[in-house]
């Protein structure tokens, strides 16, 4: 299999409410029952055609395309207020070029906002999923 036949796995840190919204999103898009258990964390890639990987690849594509608007909409203050132990690591799959593009955007957001990746991941995905970063 060539690189074009596989999606790259990468991790994002999310607050519990944003993770749950993402889990619901992937369930609705691809029927994935438990995103936390879906991808093998020890694997570096997933073959194309996998329904969960196809759904998260599309999500990453949308995040890259809409990043500027999501950045403007994101509630970084709420994401900053998340307890440091309140983040969940989850894995997504996407085309390697999309992974690289999204990582660059997240890195830029952390530099501009002078924050960490957990906060940027949570704020941007919360904006995309219309989720509240904090449990209230």
PLM segments and residue spans:
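Acidic, polar-rich N-terminal leader regions of halophilic archaeal proteins
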Residues: 1-136
């Amino acid at each position: 299999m060539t690189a074009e036949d596989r999606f790259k796995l990468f991790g994002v840190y999310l607050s519990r409410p944003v993770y749950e919204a993402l889990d619901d999103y992937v369930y609705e898009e691809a029927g994935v029952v438990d995103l936390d258990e879906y991808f093998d964390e020890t694997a570096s890639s997933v073959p194309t055609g996998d329904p969960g990987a196809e759904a998260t690849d599309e999500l990453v594509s949308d995040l890259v395309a809409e990043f500027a608007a999501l950045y403007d909409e994101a509630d970084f203050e709420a994401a900053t207020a998340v307890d440091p132990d309140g983040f969940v690591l989850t894995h997504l799959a996407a085309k390697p070029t999309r992974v690289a593009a999204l990582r660059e955007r997240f890195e830029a957001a952390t530099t501009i906002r002078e924050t960490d990746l957990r906060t940027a991941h949570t704020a941007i995905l919360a904006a995309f999923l219309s989720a509240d970063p904090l449990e209230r």
